């Protein structure tokens, strides 16, 4: 999502590079979906600085979010959306439930 949607690198180039490098495709991806405003509020309350990705422009981060949405539509069995707006307990439960489903396949 970061390279293709965020940075605008053509998808074919990224796929070719991943194939050439023999990067394995993940069996499961847990996508923590949180609105940008909420994510930044949480970061500000827990850390003093942003990392390189978090320091990107708002439009870059919005494109990355759209990329994850697109990937989740393409790979619904592999990418599980976790509603990160919920309480910590509910998020943890969503993660455990997703892992249980995955491990029991």
Residue ranges with predicted function:
Residues 37-105:
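NTP-dependent small-molecule kinase module
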Residues 1-49:
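ATP-dependent NMP and nucleoside kinases share a basic, alpha-helical "lid"
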């Amino acid at each position: 999502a970061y390279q293709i949607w965020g940075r605008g690198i053509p998808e074919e180039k990224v796929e070719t590079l991943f194939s050439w490098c023999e990067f394995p495709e993940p069996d499961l991806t847990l996508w923590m979906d949180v609105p940008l405003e909420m994510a930044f509020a949480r970061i500000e309350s827990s850390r003093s600085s942003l990392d390189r990705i978090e320091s990107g422009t708002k439009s870059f981060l919005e494109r990355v979010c759209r990329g994850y949405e697109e990937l989740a539509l393409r790979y619904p069995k592999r990418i599980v959306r976790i509603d990160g707006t919920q309480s910590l307990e509910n998020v943890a439960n969503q993660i455990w439930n997703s892992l249980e489903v995955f491990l029991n396949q």
